[in-house]
Design a protein with these regions (language model features):
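Non-heme Fe(II)/2-oxoglutarate
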Residues: 1-81
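Catalytic core of non-heme Fe(II) oxygenases with the double-stranded beta-helix
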Residues: 57-60, 64, 68-153
Length: 153
C-alpha cells in the first residue's frame, strides 16, 4: 500500500487563510455523519460539495483554487489517476470524540490537515490499517499544511 505524506503543500498565505476559516467559531459543523458504515458514528462533519457548482453554491468556492493547486503541484492525475474530486468535505474530532476504524469508498483518500497551531501533545493524526485491520500500516501525525494520500479501500 502506498501512503504518501506531503508537507508544506500550500503557500504560507493560503494555509493561513484555511487555518483561519477552519478555526472560526462561525464555521457551521454538523454533529453526525454515517460515513459509509452501517454503524452510527458521531463526529463533526461538513459537506462542501460533490461538484464545482455545488461547492460554489454552498459557499466554499475558496476551496477550488486549492484543489487546482494540489492537482498541478503533485500531478495527481499522473500519479494516482485522479482526474477530478468525488466530493470535498470536512471531518473534525474534538476531545472526547473518538474516531472509529472504517474503509473509505472511492479510489483514493486525500486528507489535508489545516490547523497550523496544532500541538503534538494533543495527539491526533490518522491511523491507516492493513487490509484485514490486524496491524497498523502507518500512523501519520497531525501537522498543519500536510496532505496525506492513500488508497481508499
Amino acid at each position: 500500500m502506498t501512503i504518501d505524506v506531503y508537507d508544506n503543500v500550500l503557500p504560507e498565505i493560503d494555509s493561513q487563510l484555511i487555518d483561519k476559516i477552519m478555526s472560526d467559531r462561525e464555521f457551521y459543523w454538523q454533529y453526525y455523519h454515517r460515513s459509509n458504515s452501517e454503524e452510527e458514528i458521531y463526529h463533526w462533519f461538513r459537506m462542501a460539495g460533490r461538484t464545482k457548482v455545488e461547492i460554489e453554491n454552498n459557499g466554499f468556492e475558496w476551496l477550488l483554487p486549492f484543489w487546482d493547486h494540489l492537482m498541478n503541484k503533485y500531478d495527481l492525475e499522473e500519479k494516482y489517476g485522479v482526474e477530478q474530486f468525488r466530493r470535498i468535505y470536512f471531518n473534525a474530532h474534538t476531545y472526547g470524540v473518538e474516531p472509529r476504524p472504517h474503509r473509505d469508498d472511492g479510489d483514493f483518500t486525500m486528507m489535508y490537515y489545516p490547523l497550523l497551531s496544532w500541538r503534538k501533545d494533543w495527539g491526533g493524526g490518522t491511523i491507516i490499517w492493513n487490509e484485514d485491520t490486524s496491524e497498523v500500516e502507518k500512523h501519520v501525525a497531525y501537522t498543519g499544511n500536510r496532505l496525506v494520500v492513500f488508497p481508499a479501500k
